[in-house]
């Protein structure tokens, strides 16, 4: 399915001294991103926000992508509309898809207060953006004439009422504009617990036009909750849909944090259900960090173990910008980091998953392969010494070679091994590390 890169982190323009230049900075990284094997970019919200220096999650003018002088200036914190268009076109030229971040639960930065006659409260619900598109007033927000509440609010920001016909149609039109005019290929839906899944389904059923052909947008939703809640949301959002949306696998992320940071974690727990990767792999977007969790609950130790897990297992893996570009986990030109794992994912990680062996300290998994992928063996070791076992694989009389590995203290390199005529082989992984073996 490919590998997604989250192409931002919180306050990245300020931290990297790229204020109003983030789009051009990403563009400068595109050759390296493409060469590494990434297939898609997830960009931060491109709309003009309530503040000039904002990450965009407080949307004011959806249609201002950095061209109207309002809320402090013309460009967004990431740059101008022209620079965004250039970034998208440059990414497409390299075969990369680009996903927009849609914040449809709430708005911010209203131009005037209004009295809502339904509850008698005054709120900042009058929006007259300079784009002159999707102007809003109290009738567009909760409580409205169509419903009083729809699931969740975000702070005290005005909460959009999607059952109001104007809001519903304007958001669909905006999504179509992003696909057809701006060039986005899909969406990440922010805070989907805040509004009905039917709204997402309505957008996903769009057939966007590009040139003389139509296409279905890719999408993933941020349902930050337990697997049961995510399941319920996926069922609602995808009911009768021929273009189902996926969801970020938050339950798996917490499990991977325990793997990396909790002393005594049993590798048996990796096989437990209750994560999308095992239960709904076709709709699972797996990740290790994102712009939210890294600020409050970061993974501190041995994070590459988590990346090895998501880049060898089923699901659509997403790599975090800081992990790749800032924190030295890419490790280009060797087999000990994310780059080698991306290559494994794209060349070998296909077909069903079989757990061949597991105990508290050793986990061995096999991907059976498919038409485009050869399959692999993933060995994860939680001991402080080399660890391995005999397993029966799908290959007989075949040489398996280590394609990616990592261990604490860089203690040695896994060896090439041959399966016997009965497909048995003994495979090992470095201390507190992993090894990925593929058929030669």
Model-derived segments and their meaning:
Residues 1-154, 160, 193-221:
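Acidic/aromatic-lined carbohydrate-recognition and catalytic surfaces
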Residues 2, 25-32, 38, 45-47, ...:
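Active-site-proximal helices and loops of the catalytic beta/alpha 8
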Residues 6, 109-170, 237-263, 328-348:
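Glycan-binding loop/region signatures in secreted carbohydrate-active enzymes
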């Amino acid at each position: 399915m490919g590998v997604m890169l989250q192409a931002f982190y919180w306050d990245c323009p300020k931290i990297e001294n790229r204020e109003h230049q983030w789009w051009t900075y990403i563009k400068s990284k595109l050759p390296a991103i493409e060469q590494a094997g990434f297939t898609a970019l997830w960009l931060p919200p491109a709309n003009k926000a309530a503040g000039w220096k904002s990450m965009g999650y407080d949307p004011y003018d959806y249609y201002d992508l950095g061209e109207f002088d309002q809320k402090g200036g013309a460009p967004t914190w990431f740059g101008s509309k022209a620079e965004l268009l250039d970034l998208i076109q440059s990414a497409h030229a390299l075969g990369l898809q680009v996903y927009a971040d849609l914040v449809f639960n709430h708005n911010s930065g209203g131009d005037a207060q209004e009295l809502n006659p339904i509850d008698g409260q005054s709120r900042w619900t009058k929006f007259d953006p300079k784009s002159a598109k999707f102007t809003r007033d109290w009738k567009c927000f909760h409580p409205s004439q169509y419903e009083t509440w729809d699931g969740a609010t975000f702070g005290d920001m005005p909460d959009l009422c999607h059952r109001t016909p104007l809001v519903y149609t304007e958001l669909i039109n905006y999504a179509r504009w992003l696909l057809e005019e701006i060039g986005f290929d899909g969406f990440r839906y922010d805070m989907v617990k805040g509004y009905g899944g039917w709204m997402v389904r309505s957008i996903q059923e769009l057939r966007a036009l590009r040139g003389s052909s139509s296409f279905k947008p890719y999408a993933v939703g941020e349902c930050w909750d337990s697997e049961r809640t995510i399941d319920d949301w996926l069922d609602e959002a995808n009911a009768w849909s021929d273009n189902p949306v996926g969801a970020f696998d938050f339950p798996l992320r917490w499990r991977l944090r325990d793997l990396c940071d909790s002393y005594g974690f049993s590798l048996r727990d990796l096989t437990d259900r209750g994560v999308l990767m095992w239960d709904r792999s076709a709709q699972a977007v797996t990740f290790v960090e994102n712009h939210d969790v890294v600020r409050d609950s970061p993974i501190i130790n041995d994070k590459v173990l988590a990346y090895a897990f998501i880049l060898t297992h089923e699901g659509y893996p997403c790599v975090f910008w800081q992990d790749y570009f800032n924190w030295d986990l890419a490790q280009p030109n060797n087999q000990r980091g994310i780059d080698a794992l991306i290559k494994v994912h794209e060349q070998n990680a296909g077909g069903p998953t079989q757990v061949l062996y597991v105990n508290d300290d050793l986990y061995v998994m096999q991907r059976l392969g498919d038409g485009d992928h050869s399959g692999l063996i993933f060995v994860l070791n939680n001991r402080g010494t080399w660890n391995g076992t005999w397993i029966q694989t799908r290959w007989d009389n075949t040489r398996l070679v280590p394609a990616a590995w990592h261990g604490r203290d860089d203690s040695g390199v896994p060896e090439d091994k041959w399966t016997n005529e009965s497909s048995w082989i003994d495979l090992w992984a470095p201390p507190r590390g992993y090894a990925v073996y593929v058929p030669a």
